[in-house]
């Protein structure tokens, strides 16, 4: 009997390590594939890379930037996706005017730190806003995130920043989704807030929203058991 495939899409500066708890729990039942974007600098080309590594039909899970990549997969090949899970992500284009310039300035400032001081130094500035405040005392968690960031280069960081700053709106994509969809958000995610995920759930026909308590943006690592349980229920419902 052919096993179902689940494709996992990491977020900004992340790799398979961000999914390790979920891979460990799900790989006994599903064929799990983690996409690698290389040094691509657009969400569209990241989605193309993910599609090239995937079988004809699969379930799709994206976290943060990976959620936006998942929406580009849905824009271009919705017929291949059996189910969709979007975690701590967004769907809007970069805003115009001062808000958009502020976002670009913030991202470019971190890129400057990466170029001048290294990726781990940049990570030490970036990570505190990515996790629940109480998790900042979890040295193993913080070190695992910093190690993951350290495996990337400033060039990859620059490419991914460009991809995010040039992101398209995916509102029409959400409205057109017809597969079982799970939307997950850490309640204390200050980067991709719960209100945004509530709006995504409203826009997506039949979507279910799962709120993960005591978690910020890095929900797969901060609360791995809760995230895994939500994914298992979503996958089982689609079987």
Q: What is each residue range found by the language model?
A:
Residues 177, 183-185, 189:
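Short beta-strand/loop motif that positions the catalytic acidic residue
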Residues 62-66, 70:
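Gly/Ala-rich beta-loop-alpha elbow adjacent to hydrolase catalytic centers
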């Amino acid at each position: 009997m052919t096993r179902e495939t689940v494709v996992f899409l990491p977020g900004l500066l992340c790799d398979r390590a961000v999914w390790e708890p979920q891979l460990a729990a799900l790989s006994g039942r599903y064929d799990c594939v983690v996409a690698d974007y290389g040094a691509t600098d657009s969400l569209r080309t990241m989605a193309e890379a993910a599609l090239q590594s995937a079988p004809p039909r699969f379930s799709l899970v994206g976290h943060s930037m990976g959620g936006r990549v998942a929406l580009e997969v849905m824009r271009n090949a919705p017929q291949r996706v059996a189910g969709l899970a979007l975690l701590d992500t967004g769907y809007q284009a970069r805003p115009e005017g001062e808000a958009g310039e502020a976002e670009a300035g913030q991202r470019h400032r971190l890129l400057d730190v990466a170029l001048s001081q290294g990726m781990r130094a940049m990570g030490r500035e970036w990570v505190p806003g990515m996790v629940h405040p109480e998790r900042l005392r979890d040295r193993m968690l913080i070190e695992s995130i910093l190690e993951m960031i350290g495996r990337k280069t400033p060039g990859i960081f620059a490419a991914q920043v460009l991809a995010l700053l040039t992101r398209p709106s995916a509102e029409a994509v959400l409205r057109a989704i017809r597969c079982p969809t799970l939307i997950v958000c850490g309640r204390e995610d200050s980067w991709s807030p719960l209100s945004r995920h509530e709006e995504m759930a409203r826009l997506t026909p039949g979507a279910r929203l799962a709120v993960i308590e005591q978690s910020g943006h890095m929900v797969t690592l901060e609360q791995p058991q809760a995230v895994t349980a939500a994914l298992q229920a979503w996958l089982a419902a689609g079987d």
